[in-house]
Amino acid sequence: DLVGINMEGPFISPNKVGAQNPEYVQGADAGMFRRLQKRAGGLIKLVDVAPEEPGNLDFIKECHNEVRISIAHTCTDYDTAVQAFEAGATHMTHLYNAMPGITHRAPGPIIAALEHGAEVELITDNVHIHPAMVRFTFNTFGADHVCLIADSMMACGLPDGQYSLGGQAVTVSGPRATLTEHPGTIAGSATCLYDCMKRAVLEMNVPLESAVRAASENPAKSIGIDNDYGSLAAGRYGNVILADKELNIQAVYQKGTRIV
């Protein structure tokens, strides 16, 4: 089932596009968002915004009651990030990636997110973030505020080779995807979410319970679908993965029916 769409662009910084096509970047536009939301049948659950760009704080103020706002692909400083959270942003997309880091005189958006109780995403493919930073994030933000993501692109589950992302050529080798013309630029990942959760536990020493919650219940809560998804409870869909002690998948159930 398609339960939500993350609108990661185009309301981002032209200086932090990552692997997105810079030709499509623009200022946040409430009218455009609403047209897309109508075409999507209300499935857009998250809109990514660089708050420092002209007019983008106004977009957050206007639209935060219609959709969750996430700070992403940004050059924002601490003070502007604080304004964004106070205006209604609640989320940070792929924390540490495509944003300023933390220094003692320029704490940046990461510390602003911590102080405002934001939900933060981590790509735990062992490519995007060092394992020590993953553990640091769980310990500082708390296991109930971390959402594991794969940030996977079209090559997920496919052989190594050449692929496309937003009209740009991408080279995939193992879990790593990079822009072919700019090999130093990561272009999402080629890893599925379950493998990211597994790596968090087995390679990064994240407690199993914390990793499972961060890959299921927390993301569902962060986009407001936790009445139906994200945990096992009466009235919710019976979507379950059964695994052995080494986290190898043994069975998959979708809405109570075994499919694997």
Residue ranges and their predicted role:
Residues 7, 63, 92, 200, ...:
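Conserved, mostly hydrophobic/aromatic
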Residues 251-260:
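Short, compositionally biased
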Residues 109-121, 138-150, 155-236, 240-242:
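His/Asp/Glu-enriched, well-ordered alpha-helical/loop segment
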Residues 26-30, 53-57, 78, 103-107, ...:
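Electropositive phosphate-/nucleotide-binding environments in soluble metabolic enzymes
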Residues 34-160:
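Active-site core of metal-dependent hydrolases
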Residues 1-43:
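Divalent-metal coordination cores built from histidine and acidic residues
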